Amino acid sequence: MPEQFLSTPEALTREFYEWERRGRGWQVWHQPVAIEPPFRPFFGHFTSGAPGAVVDDGRRPTFLTQLVDGFWKARKPLAEAITPYEKVEPSPLFIEEQVSLVEMQAVLPPETKITKDAAGQFLMSLGDVSRPASFEIVGTSDSILVQLASAPRDQRQMREQLQAYFPEALSSERKRYLEAAWDRSGGKCTVVVEYGLSKEFMRPLRCFERFDPDPLAGLIGAMATLDPDELAIFQVLFCPARHAWAESIMRAVTDGMGEPFFVDDPQVVKLATEKISSPLFAAVIRVAAQSPKSARAWRIAEGIGKSLRQLSDAASNELMPLSNDGYDEEQHRDDVVNRQSCRLGVLVNRDELVSLVHLPSA
């Protein structure tokens, strides 16, 4: 609908979603990008059309409900008028240089249990890496390996922190293991699927207080029945978010008086507060599979994807497989091995990320 025909609640709701969707991991660009979404502050809910636009701090219905003025409660405006601002959408940072990452494979001795606290502290210790790290579970008919890949300049830090938080882990450094396992000749059918957030990114995924049973157990189990010449990969590219998302998140879900922006979904304020209760990360969550048969490659990828359903919270958020429309197929295949992405990452907090990025218990 043309903007001049939108009611005020419709215009403000649309403005909210234009800002919010950047954090869901949906957007695809024509070349690899930095995975943290380009940041634009959310200053508050007001119309930005005519000069002297009046601040309207009424609470609005969600995007999926009817947007009608009857939902609004009349309130005294916070201010008589504001100075309109011009929204300039920043472009992502495009990645021109490819870096061959060093892989560190790690395994825990039998009966070793990983705590959520140790796994979370390990993630936080990687805050100064020069480029996103990659957590990977790679399955073949012979083995299932867990590895962390990082830029050569970050490898020492990765190794030291891994030893500090998981001294019992047995680790070894390798180069090009994934590249050697990944078929680039076109002789195998390849499926690559990324997962994004289904709902507003400030709604957190289900988080686990304990890793007993391990959240990754189902995913690893889905790789246990691979045939020869088949490959399965679960890959998470991740890095700490650098921008001040927390402040904008709270301004986006509240009106100017601190009340919920969405009158029929006041719970979103509590959920957003939970989201920013631990540091935010950008992450590309990816599943890849290869097999001589296309149908089989899809079944492998779907089997891994089903294991991600345990992160779903019906009252909050869930991961959903994303369309590859606009993502060049050859580029997509190369991005798996190069640990890069033409798709922006999702914004998740540490507690959400650690459910997916940790050494699985033996």
What is each PLM-predicted segment?
Residues M1-A362:
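Extended, folded cores of ATP/NTP-driven motor/assembly subunits in large transport
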